Amino acid sequence: LKILSAEGYDKTVIFSMITDGGSSAMELMLLGVCGPASSNPILFLDPTYTNYIDFANRLSIPIVSVNRQIDDNGSFASLNMNAIESTIIKDNPRGLLFIPYDNPSGQFLSKKVICDLAEIAVRNDIWLISDEAYRSLSYVGNESSSIWALNESDVKGISGRRISIESASKVWNACGLRIGGLLTDNYEFHQKA
């Protein structure tokens, strides 16, 4: 939470759980959002970080996904918000996972894009889940991007439905330390995880 505060985010209503690396946080998130051996799916944006797929499969959690297209220049096209919402309506996932500094696509998701995803999550009453392992990175011409930059004035109803996966392995280059975290602004989810 001190890192969030140092980066300028309001941490007053965020609950945290320190985990044995980001991988443990990923598993706890999946279990908390969908339940073990659940019929409740999770929504990924394809391609996604492969460990999420492995963990969901191991925990018998169904996966639904929205494929992203590659433009003629070899870059991933902007997210198709209509396809994301249609998939949510059709498959009823419990949560939508995204990575603002996307691994493996390399696509940067701006605050505007995250707001659009948040509005979809609020409209469809699902969790908005962000893998924040790269949050401290910033790129020329882009401000840092995080689920924790959103507030009620950006997206009415977002409070209480955000979850983030934290890891010291990427930005801090500390893979061997196995320090991760699961953050949420929902006390009930925090207690369940």
What label would you give each PLM region?
Residues 1-119, 135-159, 163:
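Conserved core of the PLP fold type I
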Residues 59, 151-193:
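Conserved core segment of the aminotransferase class I/II
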Residues 122:
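Helix-to-beta-strand junctions that scaffold the AdoMet/dcAdoMet cofactor pocket
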Residues 128-129:
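Residue-level marker for buried hydrophobic side chains located in beta-strands
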Residues 132:
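Walker B catalytic acidic pair
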